[in-house]
Amino acid sequence: MSEKKINLLDLDRKGLRALFTEMGEKPFRADQLMKWIYHFGVSDFEEMTNINKVLRSKLAERCVIVAPEIASFQKSADGTIKFAINVGQGQEVETVYIPEDDRATLCVSSQVGCALECTFCSTGQQGFNRNLTVSEIVGQIWRVAQFLGFVKTTGERPITNVVMMGMGEPLLNLKNVIPAMDIMLDDFGFSLSKRRVTLSTSGVVPALDILGDSIDVALAVSIHAPNDELRDILVPVNKKYPLAEFLGGIRRYIAKSNANRGRVTVEYVMLDHINDSTEQAHELAKLMKDTPCKVNLIPFNPYPGSPYGRSSNSRIDRFSKVLMEYGFTVIVRKTRGDDIDAACGQLAGDIRDRTKRLAKKRMQENQISVTMD
């Protein structure tokens, strides 16, 4: 039985240099190879003209360059494109391309499904299947860049920003997420600034500490509630790592990071009469007063069977004004791609429609109190 070939997309530069050394080659060949793969989108060794023919043959015998395929895509009226990426065994993850002015952001998945079961998130209701490999994470970027068009003569790439905000909790897949982000940041990889790579987490605190010791990228934190009582319902991982513990981890990360310029982005989904009262805005401001941050208010994007509604513009505006009175920078996120279910919280692969009856049942089970202001 022939030995399984190494997928070079699974190796960061350190891993590639080790491979070349083991093959009896100079480590700098790894740099050349990465440039072909990530700058020019080349997957055929024969096209790598500055690598000698003997080495190209050795690579072809032992290695492959294989990214997961695009199974389908949908394009929104606003230019957003949602890709279904086939990761094998009948499984798909979703990747979203968001163009805006002079930037083009790719929202990348880290897991098939998600184990955290956030009650406002469609992916969280799908359940967890498995972690994605390094090649399946960076392969999303590589494949979408190929779809959009690498400019092979210049090495220009069509993606300027990557956010680890797709399906899954990145901190539950650190083994593969860290080398994948290394490739994103590497000058011979996707060559993105550390301020242009953002990881979003719901608060797996021990893994956040490991992340801070391993790599420096921008951090977004999913808060979504101003107190533990409500967050236990909306973000169940809070029962294990409550807000005080999460905020401590965030401050430790900020202290180590240059990418965040001294503050993180707080993500707060706006759920109608659930977490959007002016009293809760005051509570959130007091909660975050010792954690340098800007606040990103995210209008809720409904999905079939969701027990929640989107906050009205007037409630979002009042909430925002309270936070600004405390000196916070507040951004209300534009909803992009909601006509193709590509907006925040809507990514769920094969998740099926839930009925209104199920939504009502979930609301009753969680005993969520509704604010009346």
UniProtKB/Swiss-Prot annotation:
GO terms for molecular function: 4 iron, 4 sulfur cluster binding; metal ion binding; rRNA (adenine(2503)-C2-)-methyltransferase activity; rRNA binding; tRNA (adenine(37)-C2)-methyltransferase activity; tRNA binding. It is found in: Cytoplasm. The keyword Amino-acid biosynthesis does not apply. It comes from the Bacteria. S-adenosyl-L-methionine binds at G168, E169, S200, S222, I223, H224, N301. One of its GO terms (biological process) is tRNA methylation. Binds 1 [4Fe-4S] cluster. The cluster is coordinated with 3 cysteines and an exchangeable S-adenosyl-L-methionine. The active site is at E94 (proton acceptor), C344 (s-methylcysteine intermediate). One of its GO terms (cellular component) is cytoplasm. Its cofactor is [4Fe-4S] cluster. [4Fe-4S] cluster binds at C114, C118, C121. Its main location: cytoplasm. It catalyses: adenosine(2503) in 23S rRNA + 2 reduced [2Fe-2S]-[ferredoxin] + 2 S-adenosyl-L-methionine = 2-methyladenosine(2503) in 23S rRNA + 5'-deoxyadenosine + L-methionine + 2 oxidized [2Fe-2S]-[ferredoxin] + S-adenosyl-L-homocysteine; adenosine(37) in tRNA + 2 reduced [2Fe-2S]-[ferredoxin] + 2 S-adenosyl-L-methionine = 2-methyladenosine(37) in tRNA + 5'-deoxyadenosine + L-methionine + 2 oxidized [2Fe-2S]-[ferredoxin] + S-adenosyl-L-homocysteine. Its EC number is 2.1.1.192. Residues 100-339 form the Radical SAM core domain. Disulfide bonds join C107-C344. Keywords: 4Fe-4S, Cytoplasm, Disulfide bond, Iron, Iron-sulfur, Metal-binding, Methyltransferase, rRNA processing, S-adenosyl-L-methionine, Transferase, tRNA processing. Reaction proceeds by a ping-pong mechanism involving intermediate methylation of a conserved cysteine residue. Specifically methylates position 2 of adenine 2503 in 23S rRNA and position 2 of adenine 37 in tRNAs. m2A2503 modification seems to play a crucial role in the proofreading step occurring at the peptidyl transferase center and thus would serve to optimize ribosomal fidelity. Belongs to the radical SAM superfamily. RlmN family. This is Dual-specificity RNA methyltransferase RlmN.
